[in-house]
């Protein structure tokens, strides 16, 4: 009798995989094990919960039981997997164990919290569960410090500002979105946030946090300090690799997989935020959707290597939305920027005159798909 497929995790990657498997096979045994409730929510909505006055429970789209019934699944919510015996094909928790034919890790990524004095005072917003734990202090806070000026930090800064809060956005870099694009491209968003009232502390590093009678004192390496009511860490995500490591599976920044989404162990696979695909960590929705589609075929006997096209990344800053694609982080590109009142087009050109990256904003985003077709990948 088939022991079937076990998926560890219940987020977007796990659900996309379940849907793709069930499109092809209605009966293969599917078991999901996860530490959370397994209720479905849309993670990108976390960037807008404060301005939209949403509580954590408002984000729920589908209850776990409904998901199990719809797709013929065995679910084990609120269950911590402690070990994987890869040779015996067994997954273990504290009081249960399950046998599998194929195992998929969709363990996601955890928010990185800088290792500073007072780090326990930092809040993170990387899941519905985390938001539920801190929604009251966040909603009550009037002065908010966001540490990290990348995608999530910029999105949260705009959202909290739209909610009428006093927002300070801090980053070590000299510009926002510094790991994604050069300052001449990100400056439009940077200026807009400043115009909204966001206070930017760039080229600044947090040294410590201290609880005070008035709230929290944040002290920088420069010894400048500010008083706030809440501090949010938006300093990036770290793929969750501990379980894979204990199973003897190769890990680097993420769980290492090849083009077939297969790890160093032939019957263990990984997709989503935890996976490092041929050396790349791609924590965005479109590569996860495509990974799930290809992996479903391979788990059911196929042999289809993942092929990723040029893809758009969306910055969810509604007052100045951005789409970007290609190698926007490359420092050797020559940028051609056209900025007008209705938006911006920035094209990153190689020395050979090829379009290798672009960023578009506002009304110029309608040109993104045409640019995507001409992008050299």
UniProtKB/Swiss-Prot annotation:
Compartment annotation: Cytoplasm
Pathway note: Nitrogen metabolism; nitric oxide reduction
EC number, UniProt record: 1.18.1.-
GO cellular component, one term: cytoplasm
Pfam families documented for this protein: Pyr_redox_2 (PF07992), Rbx_binding (PF18113)
Reaction catalysis annotation: 2 reduced [nitric oxide reductase rubredoxin domain] + NAD(+) + H(+) = 2 oxidized [nitric oxide reductase rubredoxin domain] + NADH
Stored InterPro entries: FAD-bd_OxRdtase, FAD/NAD-bd_sf, FAD/NAD-binding_dom, NO_rdtase_NorW, Rbx-bd
Free-text function comment from the UniProt entry: One of at least two accessory proteins for anaerobic nitric oxide (NO) reductase. Reduces the rubredoxin moiety of NO reductase.
Name the record gives this protein: Nitric oxide reductase FlRd-NAD(+) reductase
Source organism of the structure: Salmonella typhi
Upper taxonomic lineage: Bacteria, Pseudomonadati, Pseudomonadota, Gammaproteobacteria, Enterobacterales
Chain's gene name: norW
């Amino acid at each position: 009798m088939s022991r079937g497929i076990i998926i560890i995790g219940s987020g977007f990657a796990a659900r996309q995989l379940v849907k793709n498997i069930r499109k092809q096979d209605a009966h293969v045994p599917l078991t999901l094990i996860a530490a959370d409730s397994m209720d479905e929510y849309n993670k990108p909505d976390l960037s807008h919960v404060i301005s939209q006055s949403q509580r954590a429970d408002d984000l729920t789209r589908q209850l776990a039981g409904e998901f199990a019934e719809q797709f013929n699944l065995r679910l084990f919510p609120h269950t911590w997997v402690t070990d994987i015996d890869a040779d015996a094909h067994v997954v273990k928790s504290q009081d249960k164990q399950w046998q599998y034919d194929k195992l998929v890790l969709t363990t996601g990524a955890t928010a990185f919290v800088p290792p500073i004095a007072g780090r326990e005072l930092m809040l993170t917003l990387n899941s519905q569960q985390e938001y539920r734990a801190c929604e009251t202090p966040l909603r009550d806070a009037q002065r908010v410090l966001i540490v990290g000026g990348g995608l999530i930090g910029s999105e949260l800064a705009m959202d909290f500002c739209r909610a009428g809060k006093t927002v300070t956005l801090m980053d070590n870099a000299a510009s926002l979105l510094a790991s994604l694009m050069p300052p001449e491209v990100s400056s439009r968003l940077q200026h807009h946030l400043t115009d909204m009232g966001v206070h930017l502390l760039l080229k600044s590093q947090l040294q410590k946090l201290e609880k005070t009678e008035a709230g929290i004192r944040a002290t920088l390496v420069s010894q400048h300090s500010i008083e706030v009511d809440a501090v949010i860490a938006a300093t990036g995500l770290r793929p969750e690799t501990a379980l894979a490591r204990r199973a003897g599976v190769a890990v680097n920044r993420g769980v290492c997989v090849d083009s077939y989404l297969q790890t160093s162990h032939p019957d263990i696979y990984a997709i989503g935020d935890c996976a490092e695909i041929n050396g790349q960590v791609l924590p965005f929705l479109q590569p996860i959707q495509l990974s799930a589609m290809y992996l479903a075929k391979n788990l059911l006997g196929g042999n289809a290597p993942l092929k990723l096209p040029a893809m758009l990344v969306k910055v969810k800053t509604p007052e100045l939305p951005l789409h970007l694609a290609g190698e926007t982080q490359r420092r050797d590109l020559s940028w051609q920027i056209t900025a007008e009142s209705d938006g911006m087009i920035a094209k990153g050109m190689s020395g050979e005159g090829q379009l290798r990256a672009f960023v578009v904003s506002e009304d110029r985003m309608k040109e993104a798909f045409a640019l995507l077709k001409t992008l050299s990948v």
